[in-house]
Amino acid sequence: MTLIRSEMVGFGHCLPTKVVTNDDLAKIVETSDEWIRTRTGIVSRHISDGETTGDLSFNAAQMALKTAGMTAEDLDMIIVATVTPDNTSPSVAAKISGRLGTKSGTICTDISAACSGFIYALTMADNMIRLGQIKTALVIGAETLSKIVDWTDRNTCVLFGDGAGAVVIRAKEGQGTSADTGILATKLYADGSHYESLVVLGGVSTTQTSGFVTMDGKEVFKYAVNALSQAAENVMEIAGVTKDDVDWILPHQANIRIIEGVGKKLDLPEEKVIVSVDHHGNTSAASIPLALSENYAAGRLKKGDLVVLTAMGAGFTWGGALVRI
């Protein structure tokens, strides 16, 4: 049985030039490299110094199009996952569309699902392709979380970084088996009863400010390992594969303890778990596409590899995707 798949044909990423180490943070809050490293696995993160979410997205998009061998005019849709847009309106996607020079009529929208945002955006673009409404989409996860972090709060300011990752997906005919190239399965979830556990307290209709990230760290950690593992298991089940078939798992890069916890819960060897939190920090919606692009560019991820993507974020939202590169 033939059916339409969404094949990942281009990858791109962009990081701000400024790097902030744990030792740098120890100069402004009561912390240390040892304290941060042992609790989070983070050593350094990139922090924007004038670069906007739109700037990072644009650069990542250009790289993704180049690796795909495509131009902006080939795109039918741009979807950006972010909680730190340049403006309240219009969307970052529309801004990128204008800068790239896409054709008139290209669908543009942003989505706010926090750290799960890229999985949400990828799922929506994949569904549009599978329904035959579009053929090619640019899916971006991008954040400048440094702009919504309280730099006097050592519990949160040490965690986050800025960056962007982008993927070009394109319709391709498959045979309807797990041997197909492309997105084989996706699954999304949310549970709004945990709304207050991870929140940026600010907004247009409340405070007229952007606010700062606040978090119940213990609650998030407790929920995250189970949610990330559940999403991974479910997409494997949907596609009819087992953990032994999987080449890589790429969890949202929030915290090394969570990442390791997911690997152990799924009984996957450490060498199959992709980790980039050490030099990125938590980049929210950018973490998965950023790691995908870096690892593909480095030759670690190869065509034909079967990869599980899984993420959880504020809301709570969470989700997974199974992709054969």
Which ranges hold each PLM region?
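Condensing-enzyme catalytic core mediating Claisen C-C bond formation in acyl metabolism
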Residues: 1-50, 153-222, 226, 230, ...
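Buried hydrophobic positions in well-ordered alpha/beta secondary-structure cores of metabolic enzymes
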Residues: 8-10, 36, 64, 75-78, ...
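Acidic, glycine-rich active-site loops and adjacent beta-strand->loop/helix elements
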Residues: 14, 81-86, 113-118, 141-146, ...
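Phosphate/pyrophosphate-binding loops at sites that engage ATP/ADP/AMP, CoA/4′-phosphopantetheine
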Residues: 30, 60-76, 176, 230-247, ...
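Conserved catalytic cysteine-centered active-site region
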Residues: 35-39, 43-55, 83-137, 264-291
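Flexible, glycine-rich active-site loops centered on histidine and acidic residues
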Residues: 130-163
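Active-site pocket-lining segment
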Residues: 224-229, 243, 247-266
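Catalytic phosphate/nucleotide-handling subdomain of diverse soluble enzymes
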Residues: 290-310, 316-325
